[in-house]
Amino acid sequence: MQRNLINISFFRSLWILGLFLGLTLPTLGVSQGVPGRYLKEVLPCNGCEVSTLYPIIQWPVKKGKNVSYDVELDRDTLENTPSILFKNALPYSILIPYIPLEKGIYYWRYKVNGLQWSPYFSFSIKEDYQKNIPPDPAFFLSKIPAGHPRLLINNINQSRSIDAKNEDRIAIISEADELLLLPLPDDSIDTTRFANLNENQKGRIEKDAAYQIGYQAYQRIYLFCQAYLLTGDDKYFYKAKEMGILVTSWDRNGYSGMVDFSDAKCMLGMALVFDTFYDKLSDGEKKLLLDAIQIRAKYFYQLYKNDVEVKILSGHFWQHILHFLFQTNLILFNHVDETKEWLTYYYNIFFAKSPILSGESGGWTEGLSYFTMNMETLIDIPFFVKSYTGYDFFKVHPFYNNMASWLVYHVPAGAVGDGFADNSTHLYSPGAKYQAFAIEMAKLTQFPLYKWYADKCREYEPLNISKESTLRWFRLSKTQQLDMPTADLIIDFPLAKLFSDGGAGSMQTNAGNPTSNLAIFLRASPIGAYGHILAEQNTFNISYKGKRVFFKTGYKLGMDDPHRTGWSQLTKSANGVLINGNGQVISTEGISSFKRLVQGSTLAYVKSDASLAYKSSETKENFGVKKFVRHYLLLPPRIIIIFDE
């Protein structure tokens, strides 16, 4: 084997020596608490400065039926002075003051109904947050149109005027026509074929079959509604109505409600029929649909309120179900009295917690594969708010611009992705979903890097994205008239980029050019192994010229499949450290963080700390790790040095 001689200049040598000896360097972030599955302390932390885009007040929930809270916000703790804000009988643990707050110190307290007030907590405001504050939900509700359709489109004539040669239009009609020929699905499952399986196998197959019930019903309705809006052909109306009325007969406590995704899709499918064909349905048909939709919508509200807002992560809720609930309640508004309360909750929780698996820096802690399941939620909800109120969350929240860099560094055009979290090892290139996402974000943010990325993706993967349903109707009906950014972009990508809020970073010799790029992807997540986040803190993957050369192994078939729980979920499947054969804990508490980033034109250095990833009070495990710090050094064009302490 030929050995490469390393010729490093004197000053580079001093830098490297200083880095590894721990000389004082710029430090990233601040100390962080260990996250549990549920919020245990108030937010903002008592006595702290507001660090979010606008003040968001939360407190630990009290479990039980009919729990509610009173909350009071003041400038002092005196009993005889009027409150700035007082809310009573809140059924959940979120308060966003949708009012301008001057710089200074604020005091607040809460009480559970029937109990005493908490002590006062305080937080300080040192910046002007007024421009960031979303509109009050009451203002948003007041702007919801009275008529129908509201959801897929609000101007039928506009949809009929779309060019017949438009590829999205052609794809939708073609897919709808194929479904016209299929028999209607039902909500039963033949369990006799499970006779020779064990209980785990039966449960897995039964859930997969139950998911298909809602999926098939929704898929038909969704495409039939779209095809009708595009063509005006009543054959799509009759089929959509037939499917929607059939779903009203399905028992929510049966197979159609066994899996939350299926349950939510049944709910939204019926709502789409009600909304799209409102003027064509009889009063009896409308009532039948409304009654069935309410059963499922009420169930979800009771399930999530006073729970999911203080939970570190509820994956299905944030991936699709919040979006489905938001859409359904937009349709039901002014038809069902409770939707005012329900929609206010979903509005509040979106603006209090989103993006739930990231932050201002961008990135996504559940990785590349599962980010695709959040794309439509992250785009469609703020788009509706902007359309109704003018409030532009895409411009307010830095996440939306910073995700462009995350795409370049972690889902690189023409190359393999970073490989972290469930199913990301399957991603050998960005594919149609990421192309579609970049195009929409380019239009909505007018940030040129998104256009650059989309163009690069098409250069390496000239796909017909019309065949991918993700964001297709959004693109066709809501942003078709929006221009792409026109500003010229001078590309000067740094050697390293960290997305601390999203749990990943990357060092690359030639980012954006896969044919000559050496990339090392770094993992340091603020949430430990939970959901689709794996026990891979302080691990790394390496690619060269867009191909994997040193990567973790494994795959996921199901959350509980033996290969995942015995291999791919665990540290031993990644380029990490085992302690006497033990990897990192499977717990939200097994966190890691980036501590330093130093870079120039000839080197890049990153330090990350996973000292807390090997113990958890939740799992009652402690593998005795006092310190696990990993140092990464990239010396272009093709030298990587990794040093552990």
Residue ranges and their predicted role:
Residues 33-41, 124-153:
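Low-complexity, Pro/Ser/Thr- and charge-rich linker/hinge segments at domain boundaries
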Residues 70-103:
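Recognizes extended acidic, P/S/T-rich segments that occur
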Residues 150, 172-173, 206-413:
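Aromatic-lined, polymer-binding surfaces characteristic
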Residues 32-62:
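Pro/Thr/Ser/Gly-rich low-complexity, intrinsically disordered linker/stalk tracts
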Residues 365, 370-645:
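Extended polysaccharide-engagement surfaces of secreted carbohydrate-active enzymes
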Residues 1-32:
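Bacterial Sec-dependent N-terminal signal peptides
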Residues 115-120:
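Short Trp-Ser/Thr-centered turn/loop motifs at beta-strand boundaries
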